[in-house]
UniProtKB/Swiss-Prot annotation:
This is Uncharacterized peptidase SAS1635. Keywords: Hydrolase, Manganese, Metal-binding. PROSITE patterns: PROLINE_PEPTIDASE. It is an enzyme of class 3 (hydrolase). The lineage of its organism: Bacteria, Bacillati, Bacillota, Bacilli, Bacillales.
Amino acid sequence: MTKISKIIDELNNQQADAAWITTPLNVYYFTGYRSEPHERLFALLIKKDGKQVLFCPKMEVEEVKASPFTGEIVGYLDTENPFSLYPQTINKLLIESEHLTVARQKQLISGFNVNSFGDVDLTIKQLRNIKSEDEISKIRKAAELADKCIEIGVSYLKEGVTEREVVNHIEQTIKQYGVNEMSFDTMVLFGDHAASPHGTPGDRRLKSNEYVLFDLGVIYEHYCSDMTRTIKFGEPSKEAQEIYNIVLEAETSAIQAIKPGIPLKDIDHIARNIISEKGYGEYFPHRLGHGLGLQEHEYQDVSSTNSNLLEAGMVITIEPGIYVPGVAGVRIEDDILVTNEGYEVLTHYEK
């Protein structure tokens, strides 16, 4: 069943007339056309009969025509009201309630004479949750490039270098491999600075005998990777190395349990129980992982409360961590494809 067919099914389920897609990445997902509209209206209208109408600034119309999108295009000038160019009466409209602003909702009520609204958020998340072969190939390439980023960063480590200098070196050097954008702000943290799970790289200088935490990802043809490695520089303290070994055991055990039909919470429990049994449970303050695709964090989450089942075609991260202030912060993260038989690890840099 096609993506549009799934939306039409949901329209029928909710007795709605059309769906209004406004998140730029979701518009891309359905149309193959990517835009960053800023404050301008950029939206896809999907009607119950399957008709698709893309609203975009007039200056982008020719680019849309060159894209895979084959539906109707409503291009508007900055001085025009887009809704006046496509007058409609839509009794019930499904919207992305997690994205649409109140101001834009008021425009829809006025412009399309909308009587009531429903949500289409979950349907879109469920669609994006299962990746096509084309999507998987792009994520696999993004993961390969993330491995290269770690390699670049590790080779640049030397006493006295700052966290920020390593970040800059990675992001500049990876451009030689065709990368134009990182998935998120690259994180490189030295020693016990990594005990802050979302620390900001700064002017701290690398010293011998401490760990270096790398958390990074790249975007390849719109799809993200997201990986973490914690690398020894010299010989860290005995406790720091013990923490590393516990995190590695937790990650390895969780990954090995991945296969279709397993509740996501069970995967979280495996890693969390190992860390807790070793006495570090209070130092593992976040979920085990999350979905990965057009965004670095997307549906679903690998958490202790998520009873949904793993399905073939999902791509998730597994990233246990232990963060002890004044001692060390260790996180190890891999990107995992759920296959019919079990799993495939997409990130490969040594651990």
